[in-house]
Amino acid sequence: MKKSISIILSLLFIVCFSSASAQEQEHKPDTVTVGIYIVSIHDIDFKEKEYAINFWIWLKYKNKKFDFEKNLEVPQAKTVDKTFSIIDTSGDVVNMQMKLQCIMKDNWKITNFPFDKQKLRISFENSQFDSRYLVFKEDTVGNHYDPRFFLNGWLIDRCVVTNGINASETAFGAESFAVPR
């Protein structure tokens, strides 16, 4: 009997509620196109509530200050190891590719074991810029995982890429921020 895994990739970024000036509020955020290709998922550990994942991520954006090589965050990751990166800044658009290996933390719902379904979630954020300055747009062309790889005893039934806003319930110590809602 194979268990089912759904992979949900979220392109989230932190939103801090602030009392920004009128000029900042009129500023239109830059778009960052992001794609992912999962190479493997392994070492699923229900006791420790974690799993390992290897994947390629690519980002295309105009604002060089975003510097995703330094500012990319994977919030649910216990560890993030960058094994390869390449950046092309020769034109008006920054094209970046990175290969990452992560140990992800997740909550497992195993009450229906061995017939349970699990959803693995991966989110990405920029540690220096929030939704006032950037929005993510998912690259939906092609597969998001290698259909030839498999997890013994598991079936990958889908891979969904979405984007959204992660509203933080803190002002991160900044007195200029309004009280979080």
Residue ranges of each PLM-predicted region?
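Bacterial N-terminal signal peptides that target proteins for export
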Residues: 1-9
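Generic signature of intrinsically disordered, low-complexity, basic-rich segments
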Residues: 2, 16-18
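Bacterial N-terminal signal peptides
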Residues: 8-16
